[in-house]
């Protein structure tokens, strides 16, 4: 008894994904640019279509594509490669026959003219629809196999949309096109694309949105990109590459994923995405030769393979879809005979029993488990050299840093009056984000990014190994730069510490410095 309903882990997860405006926007952009190929489909499954997938179709898809012949095997680390390959062959590959699997991701044929689409996303009944739309200008920019061009577009994204005073973002915000403006460059797929998005926009200003973008890009081509912004973008990207700081993720895992960005489409150059030093060197040569301006003209202005997407909020959209699904299931239930209804109940009960049955212990043993004895007990030796330089303690650590020098300045706070402690949080938030004697804030940011890997201030407290009550507090200034530019790093830190303009109104402080 009761109505029919759909339920499932992936089904419910994808229903949630299809209700997020950012996810809906990204999906609609992909669909608009690649309507005829894989990228125009939803990899996780569209909730409207997931129930149509039969179990037999699911198994057939798995048999076809989830096979070693369609796999990419990647090993990372210092190892006996022959022994590892022999292990993989004996324990895995030798159990399968070689198959031909056609899993090539083909390219979308270019458009004759840009597509113009209007889509919807759901909002709550209490949420306003006014000035709550998304406007997106997106263009396909070639393939991921051209690492020089891909890296250049990452830098263009920085120069046009991310750096302080970025011309594209500034022009749209100054015109009131959206409450926020951002962009992205997607190079993790075969055909890459660049987009500019205005969030919280009036859909009636779509033509103005496009016009401003094209005017700024045209002016940029004619007058040239700010050289300092390009230099900062190249330096920023090179630093990210050299540091390879992937937070809690293993470096080998991320390298493997980066390699797939090229390897999936080009067997001849699998390591192109992780061999970028020559690319950065080449871009430094090209930055004053019109290369970046030519990319803007060719791909962002003269390229018809793109779309202008308007994503509008729609109150009641979720309820309307739910009602349509309810009516569909009610109609299906009404079409069933009593015998068919009984069979449906029986299948549901069998499925629930299968789901609740504990896993076979023998099957569980197939999953490899990390044991305590597998973990190396020896730690990496840590050494430092303590020096006295003009009465200050200097700790020097010699470690491999891929050509980057790191500097930490620690200022002891033991003599700071208690009533001034709350101001430390404010001080660390404004240093590096206000004008100095020789730079405006925007110029300072570009100079820091062009010459260094960043300068950050903070407050740090260190406890004592032998006492929970003992501690020392420091105000820290941390910076990093390529070895040849460590003197510039010191210069920029002195500029920030000694000449930052710390006289501002409460309005400036709250609205601009620490928004």
Task: List where the protein language model places each region.
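A structural signal for the main folded, soluble domain(s) of proteins
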Residues: 56-57, 82-85, 89, 97-106, ...
């Amino acid at each position: 008894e009761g109505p029919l309903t759909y339920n499932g882990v992936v089904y419910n997860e994808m229903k949630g994904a299809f209700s997020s405006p950012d996810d809906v926007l990204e999906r609609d952009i992909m669909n608009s640019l690649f309507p005829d190929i894989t990228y125009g489909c939803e990899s996780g499954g569209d909730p409207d279509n997931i129930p149509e997938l039969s179990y037999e179709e699911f198994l057939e898809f798995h048999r076809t594509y989830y096979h070693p012949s369609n796999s990419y095997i990647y090993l990372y680390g210092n190892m006996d490669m022959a022994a590892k390959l022999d292990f993989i062959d004996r324990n895995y590959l030798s159990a399968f026959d070689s198959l031909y699997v056609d899993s090539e991701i083909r390219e979308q044929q270019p458009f004759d003219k840009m597509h113009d689409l209007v889509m919807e996303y759901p909002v709550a009944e209490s949420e306003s629809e006014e000035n709550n739309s998304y406007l997106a200008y997106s263009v396909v920019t070639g393939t991921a196999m051209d690492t020089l061009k891909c890296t250049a577009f990452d830098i263009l994204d920085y120069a046009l949309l991310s750096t302080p005073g970025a011309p594209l973002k500034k022009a749209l915000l100054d015109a009131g096109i959206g409450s926020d403006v951002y962009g992205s460059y997607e190079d993790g797929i075969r055909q890459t694309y660049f987009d500019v998005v205005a969030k919280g926009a009036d859909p009636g200003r779509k033509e103005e949105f496009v016009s401003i973008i094209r005017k700024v890009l045209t002016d940029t081509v004619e007058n040239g990109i700010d050289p300092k912004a390009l230099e900062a973008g190249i330096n920023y990207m090179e630093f990210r590459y050299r540091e390879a700081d992937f937070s809690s993720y293993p470096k080998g895992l991320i390298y493997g994923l980066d390699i797939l960005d090229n390897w999936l489409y080009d067997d001849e150059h699998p390591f192109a995405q992780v061999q970028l030093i020559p690319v950065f060197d080449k871009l430094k040569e090209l930055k004053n030769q019109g290369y970046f301006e030519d990319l803007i003209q060719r791909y962002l202005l003269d390229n018809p393979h793109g779309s202008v997407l308007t994503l509008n909020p729609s109150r009641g959209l979720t309820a309307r879809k739910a009602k349509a699904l309810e009516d569909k299931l009610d109609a299906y239930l009404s079409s069933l005979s009593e015998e068919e209804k009984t069979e449906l109940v029986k299948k549901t009960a069998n499925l629930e029993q299968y789901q609740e049955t504990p896993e076979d212990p023998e099957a569980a043993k197939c999953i490899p488990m990390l044991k305590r004895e597998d973990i190396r007990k020896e730690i990496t030796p840590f050494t430092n050299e303590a020096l006295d330089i003009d009465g200050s303690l200097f700790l020097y650590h010699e470690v491999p840093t891929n050509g980057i020098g790191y500097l930490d300045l620690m200022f002891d706070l033991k003599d700071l009056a208690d009533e001034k402690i709350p101001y430390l949080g404010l001080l660390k938030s404004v240093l590096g984000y206000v004008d100095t004697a020789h730079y405006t804030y925007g110029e300072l940011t570009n100079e820091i990014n062009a010459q260094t890997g960043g300068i950050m201030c903070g407050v740090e407290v260190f406890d004592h190994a032998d006492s929970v009550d003992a501690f020392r507090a420091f105000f820290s200034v941390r910076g990093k730069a390529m070895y040849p530019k460590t003197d510039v790093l010191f210069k920029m830190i002195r500029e920030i510490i000694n000449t930052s303009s710390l006289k501002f109104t409460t309005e400036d402080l709250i609205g601009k410095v620490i928004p």
